């Protein structure tokens, strides 16, 4: 919004307001987006926490979980709404409203946030321990993921919504041909000439898995004070760098990345997400004053997945978000093995002391803060590995 306002003012007063040209610089707007989201989060945080406390929107704690967590019973939850509010205000202020990629990321983010809101509301306010039924939650996640995947399948190779529509019509008229331009290939990091053609349906399937999988993986990771939000900030910031490089024809050609016009504007969203995340961490650090809840975790995970798909870095996302991947795999392995052994031996057996993975380490004797900080360190290292793929090819 501010970029359009600055352009209008420059047309009216070109000599007096020439300094407003700074709004054209993507890096300047990204820094300002991060600062804006950070300040909004810090300013509104105490108000949101106080309001959640007054409404008695407190986090229920499982009795069969980690015993030390019982002291967290009643800590305000649904604080993810604060993150989303800060992201929304900051992004709307600083990004170019004509950019379709930012809009699709925001739609996915707030769509998943709405699912998380309903789930949290049923758990905390309606006192329904199940929240949304798994099938109901998965249906809505799948609907949003598939719609986004279908749009992005024709969007990454085109420069406008009109051309996206034209490409989609040609695809339908061709009898749903599986051909797709090279920009929709699966890119293998660290290799400059290796990529795998996905085709329309392959791209849609991969995009669906990445978006929905990322959303649920971040949600599973959000189990300790500050555990999920800092990796989200790190991975989101790294993806912002990929977005900047991918959106620039100069950097994309130099780094052998697919050039996707308009993708650079996603750096604004990534910066806002980082700023909002740091503001939330101020209140979510041990001992947490507020939890983000599903409204925050599902939304942020969906955002990371969508951005990674747009900048064609799905594999790099899996590397940088390795903690999220391990947390999700730990739950899948635990549940699968338990069901298998129960069916075969009559009694279920466990691979881990408790899933997700962070609870296993707690049960093993690690302090909560040790688990959190060590997972942060691992994520930092993985992000550096992911960023190194920009040049190491």
From Swiss-Prot:
Biological processes annotated in GO: cell division; cell wall organization; peptidoglycan biosynthetic process; regulation of cell shape
Any transmembrane segments, and where?
29-49, 75-95, 101-121, 138-158, 193-213, 226-246, 263-283, 290-310, 315-335, 370-390
Which reaction(s) does its UniProt entry say it catalyses? Answer: UDP-N-acetyl-alpha-D-muramoyl-L-alanyl-gamma-D-glutamyl-meso-2,6-diaminopimeloyl-D-alanyl-D-alanine + di-trans,octa-cis-undecaprenyl phosphate = di-trans,octa-cis-undecaprenyl diphospho-N-acetyl-alpha-D-muramoyl-L-alanyl-D-glutamyl-meso-2,6-diaminopimeloyl-D-alanyl-D-alanine + UMP
Q: InterPro entries from the entry?
A: Glycosyl_transferase_4 (IPR000715), PNAcMuramoyl-5peptid_Trfase (IPR003524), PNAcMuramoyl-5peptid_Trfase_CS (IPR018480)
**Keyword vocabulary terms for this entry:** Cell cycle, Cell division, Cell inner membrane, Cell membrane, Cell shape, Cell wall biogenesis/degradation, Magnesium, Membrane, Metal-binding, Peptidoglycan synthesis, Transferase, Transmembrane, Transmembrane helix
Q: Name one GO molecular function term.
A: metal ion binding
GO CC terms in record: plasma membrane
EC number(s) reported in the record: 2.7.8.13
Chief location bin: membrane
The membrane-topology field of this record reads:
Multi-pass membrane protein
- Cofactors per UniProt? Mg(2+)
Membrane keyword on record = yes
Q: In which pathway does it act?
A: Cell wall biogenesis; peptidoglycan biosynthesis
Q: Which family does it belong to?
A: Belongs to the glycosyltransferase 4 family. MraY subfamily.
Q: What does this protein do?
A: Catalyzes the initial step of the lipid cycle reactions in the biosynthesis of the cell wall peptidoglycan: transfers peptidoglycan precursor phospho-MurNAc-pentapeptide from UDP-MurNAc-pentapeptide onto the lipid carrier undecaprenyl phosphate, yielding undecaprenyl-pyrophosphoryl-MurNAc-pentapeptide, known as lipid I.
Q: PANTHER family recorded for this chain?
A: PHOSPHO-N-ACETYLMURAMOYL-PENTAPEPTIDE-TRANSFERASE, PHOSPHO-N-ACETYLMURAMOYL-PENTAPEPTIDE-TRANSFERASE HOMOLOG
Protein name, as recorded: Phospho-N-acetylmuramoyl-pentapeptide-transferase
């Amino acid at each position: 919004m501010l970029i359009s306002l600055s352009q209008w003012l420059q047309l009216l007063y070109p000599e007096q307001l020439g300094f407003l040209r700074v709004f054209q610089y993507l890096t300047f707007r990204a820094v300002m987006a991060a600062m804006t989201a950070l300040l909004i989060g810090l300013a509104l945080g105490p108000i949101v926490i106080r309001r959640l406390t007054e409404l008695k929107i407190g986090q229920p704690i499982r009795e069969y979980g980690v015993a030390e967590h019982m002291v967290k019973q009643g800590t305000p939850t649904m604080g993810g709404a604060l993150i989303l509010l800060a992201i929304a205000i900051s992004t709307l202020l600083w990004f170019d409203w004509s950019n379709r990629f930012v809009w699709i990321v925001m739609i996915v983010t707030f769509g998943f946030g709405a699912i998380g809101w309903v789930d949290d509301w049923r758990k905390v306010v309606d006192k329904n321990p199940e929240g949304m039924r798994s099938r109901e939650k998965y249906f809505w996640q799948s609907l949003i993921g598939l719609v986004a995947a279908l749009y992005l399948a024709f969007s990454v190779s085109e420069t406008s919504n009109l051309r996206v529509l034209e490409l989609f019509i040609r695809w339908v008229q061709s009898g749903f041909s599986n051909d797709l331009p090279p920009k929709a290939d699966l890119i293998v990091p660290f290799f400059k000439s290796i990529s795998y053609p996905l085709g329309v349906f392959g791209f849609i399937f991969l995009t669906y898995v990445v978006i929905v999988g990322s959303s649920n993986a971040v949600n599973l990771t959000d189990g300790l004070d500050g555990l999920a939000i800092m990796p989200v900030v790190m991975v989101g910031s790294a993806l912002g760098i990929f977005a900047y490089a991918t959106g620039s024809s100069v950097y994309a050609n130099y780094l052998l990345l697919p050039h996707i016009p308009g993708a650079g504007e996603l750096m604004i969203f990534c910066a806002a997400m980082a700023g909002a995340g740091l503001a939330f961490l101020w209140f979510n650090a041990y001992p947490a004053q507020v939890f983000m809840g599903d409204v925050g975790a599902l939304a942020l995970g969906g955002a990371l997945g969508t951005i990674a798909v747009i900048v064609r870095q799905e594999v790099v996302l899996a590397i940088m978000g390795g903690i999220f991947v391990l947390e999700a795999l730990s739950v899948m392995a635990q549940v699968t093995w338990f069901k298998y052994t129960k069916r075969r031996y009559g009694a279920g057996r466990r691979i881990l002391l408790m899933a997700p993975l962070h609870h296993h380490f707690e049960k093993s004797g690690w302090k909560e803060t040790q688990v959190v900080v060590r997972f942060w360190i691992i994520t930092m290292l993985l992000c550096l590995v992911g960023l190194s793929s920009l040049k190491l090819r």
